[in-house]
Amino acid sequence: MSIIKHAVISAAGMGARLGLNMPKCLLKFSGTTIIQHQLELLKDIEDVRIVGGFMEKDVIKVVKSIRSDVVFVRNPHYQDTSNTYSISLATKGLKNPHILVDGDLLINKKSFLEFIDSFDGKNSLVGVTNSSTDDAVYVEIDDKDKVINFNRNVKSKYEWSGIACLNNIIVD
């Protein structure tokens, strides 16, 4: 994991479809919040940034009790913007490879480490899966297995899985 110097967790959304009136990153599985699980996976990364918006004070409180050095980036427009906007706020000025993680992603440690280890630092690595949801961020892949587009409108065979390792590209 040494080539990755920064991590961004996008946790600004309202999680409205769940209907629980709480950020999805604060949901507990086996007694541990998703954000706590993610911070454990990212413990060796020195610069962790979390984008907050909805109920951000609750997220900050939980995160600070786990890791005090996390940088919080506020998305004041979380109700009207996409995950991409949140990511663009947190990645401004990053000059080294970084990992992006959706705040609602619960990932197996072994799978996470395999994903990180497969990142060479030269080419971006984007986690995709076969499309299976109705409200997916669909991913278009070219004939060389490179991601060429993300969108919510045009269904495709693949969807964004919520994780990516990027090398000095601009997200806007």
PLM regions and their residue ranges:
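Residue-level signal for inorganic ion chemistry
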Residues: 35, 59, 104, 139, ...
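Short beta-strand/turn micro-motifs composed of small residues
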Residues: 11, 52, 102, 128-129
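Short beta-strand-to-loop acidic/aromatic patch adjacent to the donor-nucleotide binding site
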Residues: 96-106
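Short phosphate-binding loop-to-helix
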Residues: 61, 65-98
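Conserved core of the sugar-phosphate nucleotidyltransferase
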Residues: 108-172
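Residues at the starts of beta-strands that form the adenosine-phosphate
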Residues: 6, 46-48, 69, 97, ...
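N-terminal glycine-rich phosphate-binding loop and ensuing alpha1 helix
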Residues: 2-59
